[in-house]
Amino acid sequence: MKCYALALSSGDQNSMYQAGALKGLASTLDASVMAYSAVSGTQGGAVNAALLANYPAGQEGDAADRMKAMWDSSASTRLYKDWLGGLAEGLLIKGGLWNDKAVLDWVTTEMADVSPT
């Protein structure tokens, strides 16, 4: 049996587009062609990979629908916020350019029912 891996990249809106690409593949390809043995990702792709890993083989279309709903909800939230003291505060005091608490809260809420695999 062949071992297929699905690697999901990161980068701004790319993670959002992965849901549409996965939905398109799931609706046009035979389930045996869609079968993969491993899934991984970085940044937003890792969020998608964790969500996808919680769906059994053959339910990639359902996983893609969930991804789309999740990323649609992110559009109403500014996921990264500036520090009150600006970039200087971020670099000198906080250890990062932006306050990422909003993205952490969003991921925690959206992935609350996803179990680690």
Which residue ranges define each predicted feature?
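Patatin-like phospholipase
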Residues: 1-7, 12-110
